[in-house]
Amino acid sequence: MTTEIEKELETSEAVLEKRRNFAIISHPDAGKTTLTEKLLLYGGAIHQAGAVKARRDQRKATSDWMEMEKQRGISITSTVLQFDYRDFQINLLDTPGHQDFSEDTYRTLAAADNAVMLIDAAKGLEPQTRKLFEVCKLRQLPIFTFVNKMDRPGREPLDLLDEIERELGLQTYPVNWPIGIGDRFRGVFDRATQTIHLFERRSHGSQEAQETVIELGDPKIEDYLEKDLYYQLKEDIELLSELGAELDLPAVHAGEMTPIFFGSAMTNFGVKLFLESFLDYGLAPRGRNSSLGVLDPTYPDFTGFVFKLQANMDPKHRDRVAFVRVCTGKFEKDMVVNHARTGKTIRLSRPQKLFAQDRAVIEEAYPGDVIGLNNPGVFAIGDTIYMGKKLEYEGIPCFSPELFAYLRNPNPSKFKQFQKGVSELQEEGAVQILSSIDEFKRDPILAAVGQLQFEVVQFRLLSEYGVETTLEPLAYSLARWVAGGWAALEKAGKLFNTLTVKDYWGRPVLLFKNEWNLQQVKEDHPSLQLNSIAPVGSGVQPQS
């Protein structure tokens, strides 16, 4: 007779198998926001997709909720979009489309089980895609590749496969194959079912694509497809067969092989086939490294970690939300959990399902899900919450910024608003904020990957906190954390041509003017270990 524990375990495993969680990585302008919207369209989460860069009378992108995103037509913050398709629950972790916000993307990838690598068919692999691929590789994420914009002039499909294999070291397996390219792109051939999917353009892709499905050997095929395209397709199929590669799911799940899909997100060609295959081949929620070792998602007690904080998602209520990835067990509304960093207990009374800016209170959640929790200043990025035995998940890394500037508040009457705004934007990781160790220099130092991060901080301080600010750039371009902390820095003695500051967690950070300056310090102080990446949320208390 099956025990209650066995029944609960079976239910848990069944729930896990029907969950998929993924983030999309791409270079700017590869079509990430468009693909995101089309996946939501097919998932029934929206009924009409609007192009972000289209005319003003078209709808704004669902995933772009911040005022500055709507004004500029770019994604500058990550968000979560949950929807159902077939009998799966899908958590789409939407990442910023602009390269200046790559650190937000890094944090989001820490919560993902799968990655979708989006490539422009004309451009192939681009710098930002390569950077983000390296993060996926470190985390051994399965990578599914969608070659986009096949309806425009582009490179030969075989050239793109060769580039991925040569430059990323991934085996490739085309799950489907394009029929034509550019203005002669007609659809794709599905290798698993040996069927041809021909698409019709509709409303600039704002509604689901209509398709005609034909068996490869159907004699009526020439009624639908030009002879030269049909014969070229047959040659391509023969060539793929000669290459002999088979789809190896264990290799896919280990991040060694990438399934390749061809299509056009703008016109919806190939999007549904991609979504269907991803659900079949994608990885269900998996175990994560913790202080207790790798915890399987079937571990009975609830655990999760904070990978993102966001202030003022609802301008009317000036709220602050912590994005929590559920890792193990079952989350239930009103449960009391332990906060690993502070040792306190917290009642989670209003957990929310997230869909960009929209939210709804939920009763329960399972591993792979992302929930929103009200954050009255309790949570920091990387925090672990848990029930049962004490544990802590690995911290989320903090990457080296390249631009630095003092942030000034010229209006003393706005001091409180300025302090509050800076503190809250620092907590959510909108930008790294460093502090001078000179007690007479009170102005915070903004540290960013790109100039647009500075603009966003100033824009949000003005629009959300009513504070106008000015920037004073600093002539530094590299930051390194000191291994061993202040004791190691004191032991090293005097350092030339560097600026010593401290980060949010009170740790020493050295700023260098250039690479030569950094190398000189390393040569003069060989025992001083400098790191370009610092972990966050590993038990260290932030300093105000």
From Swiss-Prot:
- Principal subcellular localization: cytoplasm
Q: Where in the cell is it found?
A: Cytoplasm
Q: Name one GO biological process term.
A: regulation of translational termination
Recorded hits in CDD domains, A to Z, give: RF3 (cd04169), RF3_II (cd03689)
Query: Which keywords, in A-to-Z order, does the entry hold?
Result: Cytoplasm, GTP-binding, Nucleotide-binding, Protein biosynthesis
- Per its UniProt record, what Pfam families does this chain match? EF-G_D2, GTP_EFTU, RF3_C
Cellular compartments per GO CC: cytosol
This entry's Gene Ontology molecular function terms read: GTP binding; GTPase activity; translation release factor activity, codon nonspecific; translation release factor activity, codon specific
Give the residues the record marks as binding GTP. Answer: 26-33, 94-98, 148-151
Q: Does the keyword Ribosomal protein apply?
A: no
Any idea where the tr-type G domain is? 17-286
Q: Which PANTHER family match?
A: PEPTIDE CHAIN RELEASE FACTOR RF3 (PTHR43556:SF2)
Question: Main role?
Answer: Increases the formation of ribosomal termination complexes and stimulates activities of RF-1 and RF-2. It binds guanine nucleotides and has strong preference for UGA stop codons. It may interact directly with the ribosome. The stimulation of RF-1 and RF-2 is significantly reduced by GTP and GDP, but not by GMP.
Stored NCBIfam families:
prfC, PRK00741.1, small_GTP
By sequence similarity, the record places it as follows: Belongs to the TRAFAC class translation factor GTPase superfamily. Classic translation factor GTPase family. PrfC subfamily.
Designated name of the protein: Peptide chain release factor 3
The species is Microcystis aeruginosa (strain NIES-843 / IAM M-2473)
What gene does the UniProt entry assign to this protein? prfC
